[in-house]
Amino acid sequence: MLLAYTRLSHIHGNIDDSITLDHDTRKKARIKSTTDTGIDIGVFLERGHPLLVGEILKTECGKFIVVKGKAEDVATAIADDWLSFSKICYHLGNRHTSLQIGERWVRFKPDHVLEELAENYGLSINKTPAVFEPESGAYGKSGHNHGHSHSHED
């Protein structure tokens, strides 16, 4: 089993493998999974810093594993104008739900109440599965830990 304790934002070498994870799994500090080529991997990271799509895990044996996002069930609310978009972002933000924000679209986990709210503001809802990469929040860090590592050896 590969063991990864280090995360990097980039490397100047070759990527050895990839791991595809959904948003809820990327939020965990301890992950037991399988790489995309079928190798078992254990990931042990600092709590409170979700893995970001594109980050690279460095294993104890020196392999580099890139993190990919897995498409999952989401609701994407699409606005025709900036005023409707601004209003729905305000109201969804007041509900403290995780949101991914793009140009005149906002994505969240499926929730019929939130979907109806968005429709009431004139937005259309697209339920095509997509990679979910929500904002880190007002007090969150960017999520990028450049080269952070620590030893687990005694």
Curated annotation (Swiss-Prot):
Residues 143-154 have a biased composition (Basic residues). GO terms for cellular component: cytoplasm. Involved in urease metallocenter assembly. Binds nickel. Probably functions as a nickel donor during metallocenter assembly. Keywords: Chaperone, Cytoplasm, Nickel. It holds the Pfam family UreE_C. Its main location: cytoplasm. SMART domains: UreE_N. One of its GO terms (biological process) is urea metabolic process. It comes from Alteromonas mediterranea (strain DSM 17117 / CIP 110805 / LMG 28347 / Deep ecotype). This is Urease accessory protein UreE. GO terms for molecular function: nickel cation binding; unfolded protein binding. Residues 134-154 are annotated as: Disordered. Belongs to the UreE family. It is found in: Cytoplasm.
